[in-house]
């Protein structure tokens, strides 16, 4: 009887162990192909590949993963990988936007909007992975000492779904970036064509000038010297004519200034004479009045002096 119970117990434990340690599902062919493309693609794809590898390691739910999930280390590393991926993606998007400048504004706005939406979906997928692991860590800490088999199975199922969604959105983002890059390449080619069209007439003008210079170089030296002398003579005559015209203008300006000064001097002289006349008209009556008063005063003084010097009659006569 004891032997039978021991056999049953061993069988039960073996079954539990086999059930708990479930083998990780092998990656599907699209996942392997996508990961291979990330390993040899743009910097943002390489960063996403590192996030993908780390998520695959977490999905194994090994003992080391279980221990690190009890601490914030896994979520911190996932956050770092997320930030690195989004940073590289924004840098690549900015680079493509610079190359897309020759494209029509409407097309550029539409492509940018679609790419931004795909970028947001990818960021949301990575954020969901991190949030799910944070939730699992909280639940795992609350169940210390208890069976976590059901919790692990639920996490494994969620991680599989999140990986599939992440793969789908990453593939969609790659396709939209390819369209964006094709538009940038087309815009660059249009820009080159426009530059070529603008430079064409300039090149033709340069060719004509070179031909003209070549024909001038083929002329005899005496003819070229004579033509140069005529041009210099015409230039000197033109400068002399301009100088004479300028001198005439200066003379006219000086004459105008002199006439204005003489006119102003005459006006000042007339104003001074008028002012002098007004002063004279003001003070002449006053002077005449003072003279009359002075003459009257002198007469009164003389009369008073004459009266005081007259002889007094004597009483003896």
Curated annotation (Swiss-Prot):
The protein, known as: Apolipoprotein E
Binding site for heparin: 162-165, 229-236
Residue numbers spanned by region Lipid-binding and lipoprotein association: 210-290
Annotated region described as Homooligomerization, given as residue ranges: 266-317
The keyword Nucleus appears for this protein: no
Region (8 X 22 AA approximate tandem repeats): 80-255
Keyword Isomerase included in the entry's annotation: no
GO biological process, one term: cholesterol efflux
Residue numbers spanned by region Specificity for association with VLDL: 278-290
Post-translational modification: APOE exists as multiple glycosylated and sialylated glycoforms within cells and in plasma. The extent of glycosylation and sialylation are tissue and context specific.
Methionine sulfoxide carried by residues: 143
Subcellular location: Secreted; Secreted, Extracellular space; Secreted, Extracellular space, Extracellular matrix; Extracellular vesicle
Coiled-coil region list: none
One Pfam match: Apolipoprotein
Signal peptide: 1-18
Sequence repeat coordinates: 80-101, 102-123, 124-145, 146-167, 168-189, 190-211, 212-233, 234-255
Principal cellular location given in the protein's record: secreted
InterPro entries: ApoA_E, Apolipoprotein_A1/A4/E
Protein keywords: Chylomicron, Endosome, Extracellular matrix, Glycoprotein, HDL, Heparin-binding, Lipid transport, Lipid-binding, Oxidation, Phosphoprotein, Repeat, Secreted, Signal, Transport, VLDL
Residues that bear Phosphoserine: 147
Region (LDL and other lipoprotein receptors binding): 158-168
């Amino acid at each position: 009887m004891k032997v039978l119970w021991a056999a049953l117990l061993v069988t039960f434990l073996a079954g539990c162990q086999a059930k708990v340690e479930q083998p990780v599902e092998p990656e599907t062919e699209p996942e392997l192909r996508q990961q291979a493309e990330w390993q040899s693609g743009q910097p943002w794809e390489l960063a996403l590949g590192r996030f993908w590898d780390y998520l695959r390691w977490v999905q194994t739910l090994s003992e080391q993963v279980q221990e690190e999930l009890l601490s914030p280390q896994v979520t911190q590393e996932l956050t770092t990988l997320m930030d690195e991926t989004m940073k590289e993606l924004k840098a690549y998007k900015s680079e493509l936007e610079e190359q897309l400048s020759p494209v029509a504004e409407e097309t550029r706005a539409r492509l940018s909007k679609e790419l931004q939406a795909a970028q947001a979906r990818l960021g949301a997928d990575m954020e969901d992975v991190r949030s799910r692991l944070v939730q699992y860590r909280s639940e795992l800490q609350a169940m210390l000492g208890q069976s976590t088999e059901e919790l692990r199975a639920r996490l494994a199922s969620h991680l599989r779904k999140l990986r599939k969604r992440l793969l789908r959105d990453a593939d969609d983002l790659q396709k939209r970036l390819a369209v964006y890059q094709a538009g940038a390449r087309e815009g660059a080619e249009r820009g080159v064509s426009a530059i070529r069209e603008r430079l064409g007439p300039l090149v033709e003008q340069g060719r004509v000038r070179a031909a003209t210079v070549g024909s001038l170089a083929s002329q005899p030296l005496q003819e070229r010297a004579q033509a140069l002398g005529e041009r210099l003579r015409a230039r000197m005559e033109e400068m002399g004519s301009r100088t004479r015209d300028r001198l005439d203008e200066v003379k006219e300006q000086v004459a105008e200034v002199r006439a204005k000064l003489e006119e102003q001097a005459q006006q000042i002289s007339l104003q001074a004479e008028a002012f002098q006349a007004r002063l004279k008209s003001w003070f002449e009556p006053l002077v005449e009045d003072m003279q009359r008063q002075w003459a009257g005063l002198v007469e009164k003084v003389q009369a008073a002096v004459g009266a005081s010097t007259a002889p007094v009659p004597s009483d003896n006569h």
